[in-house]
Amino acid sequence: EKYGGNIKGFVATDCDDKKSITQLKRKIVEELQAMESLKARFPRRWFAIKDALSQMKAEHISFEDYRTLCQKNGESDPASQTSLAGFLHDLGIALNYGLGNRGQDQRLRFNYVLKPEWVTQGIYALLHAFVRKKGVFTRAEAVSELAKKDYSPEDTHFILELMELFELSFPLDDRHNRVLIPELLADQQPKDAASFKPAECLNFGYKYPVLTEGLLPRFIARTHHLGRAETRWKSGVILKDPSTGCSALVRADAAEAEVRVHIDGPQEGRRELLGIIRFNFDVIHSDYEFKPEAQVYPPAAPQKALAVDELEALARSKATTVSVVLPDKTVIDQDIATLIDPLATRPPLKLFLSYSHQDENFINELRKDLKLMQMNGLVYPWHDRNITAGEQWEPSILEELNAADMVICQLSRNYFASDYCIAELKAAIQRKLAGEAELVAYVLTDCGWKEFPGLSKFQLLPTDGKPLSDWNDSNKYWRAVIEGIQKAVKKFQAERKIRPARGTLDM
């Protein structure tokens, strides 16, 4: 299942049995002869390009240099150049990790590695340099370290992108300025992990067909704001949520292909912290073809896994208890509602960001401040840059606006000069008055917003609609805006119904 169609068959072999080895060789030859790529005929000029690349002394060349080399050797067609690049990559002559589906980050496409050991040496230099920092460092620190090995800043950034592509490292922030290398985390869990007593905790977990190596490091990176360096290790992390006073032990077991979560602290805060944990795992799970099975572990029998889907099915059939067999063969009945009620969550609020494209750099500042709320599963911001290529943008915007729980408008002179923005604002006011959505607006520049019909009835952010230009410190302005939004989100969520438990949260 892991390798899909790449597995062509299985051949039983025994080193003492020459016939089985002969059979294996025959099978390999048969599969090689069936490969269409081996039958391809290459133009003579492609061999000249291959030889030229092999003779170069540089560690890597740029995309443009590669194209120039192709043209000098008679290959001027861009499509043929790209096709040849794919073959050169497969042959290990000029590696390009951004071609086709080899990498999502197209920045990798602009470098051809001619000496693989150059990449390997750079990676090992970073591993050695940041052992004492337990694998957490900044890009600037990486640039400084690799400069000692004659790597340019551009070379360092390329190697970091390559490490991220192969999940050797993970970003700790949106701008990828802070980096985590899981391989440098401690092998052993900290002593604090022993303080979690499953019999006294809210216990939850996931069962996987196979536990991928990158899953837990991605989770650690996504929830780094709730963890500390000394409470992270290769197979787990301890999180602490200051807003609820609760802590969580999240630990992976590769042999059992499962992740277990134990949450202690005030009862009323456990559900909220579990919601944050589940939200971040669901974001990660959305990248996988398989879906893990959500499980709960009764405090009275913390080693006994009960599938959430099965408990929900029992609850729908009006069953009130489920029988659990203990290790000593004793059978106890557990209340189903007690097991699944703590899993109920409030879905993240869908935010629609309404702004003028001329003020896009300012809306990006807001998105940075919303990121923490998004990672905590409180909000899901949407703006028109989310529209995918080929999608009709006007119907998509209208659909998202009508589906939003809260519309956030960035008011400015540019905003009121746009017919599209005005239409969005009118629709937002109508939905607010109809009780269909919340409206939050903040004033970016002096724009005469009080003259807009119906808008003067609302309290605008920040304090009394004071524009950015009237603040001595822009950071204080954005802090006032985000605190106002947080207050509105908290009020909206408090009035919202809790959603019943489900194995996977909706994204």
Which residue stretches match the model-derived regions?
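Extended, non-catalytic interaction/assembly segments in eukaryotic proteins
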Residues: 1-345
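Conserved beta-strand scaffold positions in the cores of enzyme catalytic domains, especially
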Residues: 9-12, 381, 439-441, 460, ...
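C-terminal helix of von Willebrand factor
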Residues: 16-33, 470-493
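Short acidic, S/G/P-rich loop/turn micro-motifs used as interaction or catalytic elements
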Residues: 17-19, 265-270, 358-361, 387-388, ...
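Short beta-alpha junction loops
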Residues: 296-301, 413-414, 442-450
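Conserved N-terminal substructure of TIR/SEFIR domains
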Residues: 343-410, 429-438, 444-447, 476-507
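Conserved TIR/SEFIR loop-to-helix hotspot centered on a Trp-containing motif
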Residues: 413-434
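Glycine-rich, charge-decorated loop segments at or immediately adjacent to ligand/cofactor-binding or catalytic sites
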Residues: 447-462
